[in-house]
Amino acid sequence: MALELIERGCPNCGGVISSDRLEKGLPCSKCLPKPTEEKVCDALEELKTLKYLKPFCDTDKSLERFINFFEKAVGAKPWSLQRVWAKRVFMNQSFAIVAPTGVGKTTFGLVMSLFLKGRVLAIFPTRLLAQQAGDRLSELAQKVGVNKKILIYQSKKNIREQFLNGDWDILLGTNMFLHKNFENLINFKFKLIFIDDIDSFLKRGKNVDYLFKLLGFSGEEIKLALKENKTQRDYDRLARIRKRKRDTVLIVSSATLKPRGKRAYLFRNLLGFDVQKAITTLRNIVDVAEPVKDLEEALEKSVELIKKLGKGGLVYLSVFYGKDKVQEVKEFYRKHGINAVSYLDYKPEELYQILEKGEFDVAVGISHITNPLVRGIDLPHIIRYAVFLDPPKHVFPTELTLSPPLLHGLLLTLLNLFEGDDRLKAIQYVMYLKRYLTLREEQLDNYPRIKERVEEIKNFLENYLKDENFLKKIKESEDISLVPKEGKLYIVVGDANSYIQASGRTSRFIAGGMTKGLSVVYYSDPKAFYSLKKRLALYYMTQEIEFKRLSEVDLNKLIKEIDEDRKRAREILQGKGVAQIKDLFKTTLVIVESPNKARTIAGFFGKPQMRLVEDSVAYEVPLGDRLLVITASLGHVLDLVTDKGFFGVLDDTYPYLPVYDTIKICRETHEQHTEYEYLKKRCKGKIEDKLEIIKGVREVSYEVDEVFIATDPDAEGEKIGYDLYLLSKPFNFNIKRAEFHEVTPKAFREAIQNPREVDLNLVKAQLVRRILDRWVGFTLSHILWDAFGKKWLSAGRVQTPVLGWVIKRYEESKEKKGEILLHVNDFPLKIEIEDLMFAKEIFKDLELADISLSNPQEEEKRPLPPYTTDTVLEDANEKLHLSAHKTMKILQELFEAGYITYHRTDSTRVSDAGKYLVAKPYITKMFGEEYFYPRSWGEGGAHECIRPTRPLEPKDLEFMITAGIAEFEDPENALKVYELIFKRFMASQMRPAKVITEEIILKLPYFEWKERVVTEVKEHGFDLMYPTFKVFPKKEKLEITHKEFREVPKVYPYTQGTLIQEMKRRGLGRPSTYAQIVQTLLERHYVVEEKGFLIPTDLGREVYEYLTKHFPEWTSEELTRKLEEAMDKIERGELDYMEVLKEVHRIKVLLKEEKAFKK
């Protein structure tokens, strides 16, 4: 049975289609009246109804032919990645190849050159490579029996004539050939242009211009793509240019680490892909750390280790030792029979050639990001291990210069040691210097205002570095060292980036996965090593690096594994062994809701390559056994229409059938609607249609082996996922749902390793929620429009009873009571008296009161449970004065960036990961293991409380924000909300506090008041993290040190936080809707906020009175609660969703009675 109809959802004709057809991967019944067992493409061709699916059907046929052709040429079928590339070529898409070493990039390009009809141009960096490719092409052509004219360009007269006459099918040349012969090349039309090495190609800007002219772009279009400070109109025009059908496909075979010059942007702006290489930060490395007495002992131990490990090692000294020490170390090794080379002995190109030949045991360098042995060495078959003679370090002189990068780095290093206003000043200085990191000291004279500010920053730091107390603070800190050298003082901290890059040379990405490596760090200064570990955890949260001792490692077994991987790498580089591993490498599309989440996930595994597909942005990054492609749907793609049936639901027959269409958004106002014409009347700017996002998702789904839909883990996320599942199913049958409750590498990996089917019960519950909101809301809203003559008024099944609570509470707040605030021995107490006159009398006689303490008892104080959506919204409102709407936006950002678990939850449950991987390490480190007291709090189930995803302190997140590692729209409040969550969670996993409580008794002849207070803490616990009580100061004499009388409401009006608590308590709304309900009441001007309290307006009262008087059944709290309970039952599969819709359908009668329903 179909759950919904989707207008413009048919993949073939763009017409209306039912969900049950899409689930089977079929087009609509108009295109294909009867479901068929044969291929859909063949059936549509037979019926002559093939339309929008034609490019995909044609590609399928071409791919089938190409697979046979490839197998004939190479002796094996193309593997997954090569099939993806082939599909892109046949779909006329240009792209840069993202792939590990040894997956047959050049082989693919050559076979595709032979397969395609039309001319092919292949550009290589050198004539030798062009010649080798030409020879290989001839060999492949012979195997498949293809008679194509292959011309390797040389300046010989006969070859030049052959070129000019067009007597060739495939032309191979160098970068210089293109530069010199563009005027002749422009006369030819190419089907494919293949660039083998984009790095060398980009060195000549003119060549890039020539390339884009060969691809059919005009000079004006190239100029627009290179224009700085583009307007929105420019971007719209570029989008139209990108979508224009082109006859020539460009394949860039190897992407570049650092695109040179602005011409690299031509690829993104005109072709929709980056030429920046996707860098994987995945590593398969055993990390070892060994304490030593000094550098001499490190050297002696390393000799022993190197002799055991053998050839293919890299040895690093930190920058603290300098170049002279590098040569000393090299000579030391040579004396001990180790064939050591130094990076100083050769130019970088020569050094690489020596390493590539394997003519060395170890190469010695400096563990700094600019050292040639730290970056750019990609020799998976040669490099086996790395030895660090001391931890990589950042070294800052205490004698400062005006260098912006130096001052920036030093400020960041010392940030946590500054206090109060100076800490804020230091953060501002870091933010300022961030803009000028490329500015050299000698350039500052050209910018007097900048120089003046940099001098101010230098003076700020110098004053601190002259302060003995501050220097003492540095010495006592756990991760910053003050080191003397040659009569000068240096500030030293660990260099995480250099460690990741240098050790990463031992584990490279090849076909079939990461090669195994070993990294050994010797350290004589425990502080320096701790500093490195801390920064690795901070900067590389996804790496989860854990150092072992050498004694814990089975070295013989590890050496064997390392050597097996090197053998595999050699075979792959020689073209052997690929057939065995090719099927292990898959292509996977992951669809999430937001671009932020897409970027976060892609960033877990390296620096992704960006690609535009229609209006979708796709991030591509290699992940072990697969190429990961991540894209975002930007929330819901479909919504209920308004112009069909009963407000979007066909109700002439039973069961009812909701009708959905793509969401259209006004770019200027962000207003959304499913009807283009409706929005056009209200929108001055461009209207964007989610259909364009769907087209992009469909296209990428078609390319890959499998699709995982990873929308949010709740009913709303399930409905978004279901829509994406339906719309993608005709293009890929292998679609699964991946669910994770925190955006972390571990949770993500587990989700894609344990996918599930879409949960139709959750989908049905969300369908019901949307339809009920529409039926009740629209029906009552239409009636209000007629009654009040205001078309912006609205009513809702939750909104209306909640408005009633606000009105009732406000009326109750007009009644006053007495509140006596007094301090006894400076301890604040509050006495509340209902009778105002009596309260005043007590206040007057307070000086006569007898105050005593009695009845001591030992008690255990327990912490509060961790946050749920309602409690965090209440606290953020009360403590930080943030609106519920603002807090939800911040929570969404924190979740998507991977700092907290899913924030729409009513569960207090803490998982084992939360208890033992997040709480325990932090509590043990800060207070001692005896303070750790694991609690599960809530019952089992999928949902968890809101908690941090790792033991990252708020001050560390502040550091990350300042350093630009973490970015938020409102960083200040994001940090405050994170701090609330962090402290409350950590306290929830700490032991109870044991206290002595006593009754404080205040007595008058006519009145007695008692309250139990804590007078002593016998044993601290959670109170050290998140105190929920104050300790009363016991003295011999108890006296009133302050008193104050106030008339206060008997009950206060609701705040946003207390209203949400009331909604939770009374079972109205859900975690995903609490904030929106409050926001709607404010937006409709039914309530206003005054001093944090919600006050009903006259309009709010009138609307509520009208609705409750005329339609009590549909605005009652009881009905709303019953419907919420019914939806929970639908989620659990205990209730038929149609029964609920049938019950509520009665509301349609109201429209007929009021004659308000206008078709």
Curated annotation (Swiss-Prot):
Topo IA-type catalytic domain: residues covered: 759-1152
GO function terms (MF aspect): ATP binding; ATP hydrolysis activity; DNA binding; DNA topoisomerase type II (double strand cut, ATP-hydrolyzing) activity; reverse gyrase activity; zinc ion binding
PROSITE patterns: HELICASE_ATP_BIND_1, TOPO_IA_2, TOPRIM, ZF_RG_N
Name of the top EC class for this enzyme: isomerase
Location of the Toprim domain: 587-743
One GO cellular component, as annotated: cytoplasm
Residue ranges, annotated region (Topoisomerase I): 583-1159
Family listed: In the N-terminal section; belongs to the DEAD box helicase family. DDVD subfamily. In the C-terminal section; belongs to the type IA topoisomerase family.
Name by which UniProt lists this protein: Reverse gyrase 2
NCBIfam families on file: rgy
Quaternary assembly: Monomer.
